Amino acid sequence: MRQLDRRSALAQGLSEDELMIKAGGAAFRALSEKWPEAATLAVLCGRGNNGGDGWVVARLALEAGLACDVYVTGDPSDITGSAQCAHARWAAVSGSAPRPISALFSTDVALDQYDLIVDALVGIGMTHRPRPEFEDWIAALADAQSPIMSLDIPSGLSADGGPSSGAAIRADLTMTFIAPKPVLLTGPRLDHVGDLIIDPLDTPASTYREITPVALALRNEQSGWLPVRSRIAHKGSFGHVLVIGGDTGMGGAALLAAAGALRGGAGLVSLATRQCHVMAALSRYPEVMVRGIEDPSALKNLLIGKDVIVIGPGLGQDVWGQTCLEIALKTSVPVVCDADAINLIASGVVSVSGAGPRVLTPHPGEAARLAGCTVADIEADRLGSAKRLALKTESTIALKGAGTVVAAPTPDALPIICCHGNPGMATGGMGDVLAGLIGALLAQRLEPIAATAIAVGAHAEAADMAWQEQGVGLTPSDVVERLGGVLTQV
């Protein structure tokens, strides 16, 4: 991260000090826009560059006529580098010394006297578990009624999204600079981020190509990933997806997967499910060719001529589901494994290895079973977990959750983090739709990593559109109905 900061400054002909002034200025403009009525600020500054951004914000606040108190960790004389320059400029305007941060949490100071608290304590500089006094400060801030804005990342978090424990600032707004940090996009600490603003600080595009990132960010402004459809195309041009699932009582999951494949643009969609679900499936989606199978051996004929298999939604883990999965995984076409298919693979009764490409879409619990670890282990390092699972299973992985991570089964491939999605997606059936959508894009001849990444992004963006209308009442069917429009823009 620091290397990227230096290269950004160099590319723009700026000193590190000038880049810090630019970052602090952007932060002050952002807080002024979000909290225009804020007249009294408390800025918490560490002794590093994150604190330097804070000194810039504090100086600009004073120059704008706001009341602003600065609280600093340690002795201000220990501040060095560009942060020292920023501190000196603040001191020249303030005419006073900063207060020790311990004073902020004394009985003589009321936190709620401030309209806004700015966190410039550590940022990306946190490389170890916070000291006990830091944890005490965070606990006190948690009781404050004033909103908190964090600069770069909420202090206490690990920037790369790796293992992070202990206390961390819970911000209402985080403003990060030059490039997003993984911890701001994925993982169990997203509630600490609040609203997120990413300001590139005018960093040239060429600068990003000089640095090897830890991950790629998947965002809705990216386009041109899907091939343009020929005017003389026919249904065979876009592949035939076979969805297998829906054991007794679980037909809805398989039907949602089939719906995802339909709206994902597959030329043909077939569904193999229990006989008891056939009538309901045909009534809901007459476009789907539905076949009731009680004997899994009937799948062998159904597999002929299919371009992609999606298996797992509502599959169950008894003999019927296990046998269906064994047959499906013997084929050489791409197979998308979701839900119970993943659980069966994790249990060891079925091997995922096969002649064709495989895509697995585990949620954290399923990922933990695949990896033989705890859910906490998976969530503590989502990037690393997805990469390790991809290599272990020789499959493309979509590790679902807040900030879904997509990883390819090659050691040098960068994981991809989805920047979209919302809490309304935390409902049964969302993953089934995603599995069908991935299958549809595979059927259109996309490579597994591209098909999975595009599907994850489109699925999340469609859900964001539905969230604006439905809120907590969001359903997987709402997402299905918006997929076609989203994919048209990809």
Predicted regions and their residues:
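N-terminal small/polar loop signature for handling phosphorylated ligands or for N-terminal nucleophile
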Residues: 58-143, 279-292, 298-305
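Internal gly/pro-rich beta-alpha loop/helix module
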Residues: 115-116, 121-212
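Short acidic-hydrophobic sequence patches enriched in Asp/Glu that either
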Residues: 82, 133, 167-170, 429, ...
